[in-house]
Swiss-Prot record:
GO terms for biological process: ribosomal small subunit assembly; translation. GO terms for cellular component: cytoplasm; small ribosomal subunit. Protein S19 forms a complex with S13 that binds strongly to the 16S ribosomal RNA. This is Small ribosomal subunit protein uS19. Pfam families: Ribosomal_S19. Belongs to the universal ribosomal protein uS19 family. PANTHER family: RIBOSOMAL PROTEIN S19P FAMILY MEMBER, SMALL RIBOSOMAL SUBUNIT PROTEIN US19M.
Length: 93
């Protein structure tokens, strides 16, 4: 179930303040955040936000088509290493 429309989208206040402060600067440093739950607003477009995946911050460049999604959608938390397969080398028949 999604979020109620009457509540509106959510973004952490500290993240909004950092993005607004960065819009005034010419040089745009990477913004570090742990807030994977924040919704991407149109004001975020053009910013690079480093989102925490549980062990490191992964930089994400915000584009037009990302607006409305959550930051955590673009940084997976789990690494898929593949399913177990037949190991032909060790079967000693």
């Amino acid at each position: 179930m999604g979020r109620s429309l009457k509540k509106g989208p959510f973004a952490d206040e500290h993240l909004l303040k950092k993005v607004d402060a960065q819009k005034d600067q010419d040089k745009k440093p990477v913004i570090k955040t742990w807030s994977r739950r924040s919704t991407i607003f149109p004001s975020f477009i053009g910013c690079t936000i480093a989102v925490y995946d549980g062990r490191k911050h992964v930089p994400v460049y915000i584009q037009d088509d990302m607006v409305g999604h959550k930051l955590g959608e673009f940084v997976p938390t789990r690494t898929f290493r593949g399913h177990g397969g037949d190991d032909k080398k060790t079967s000693g028949k």
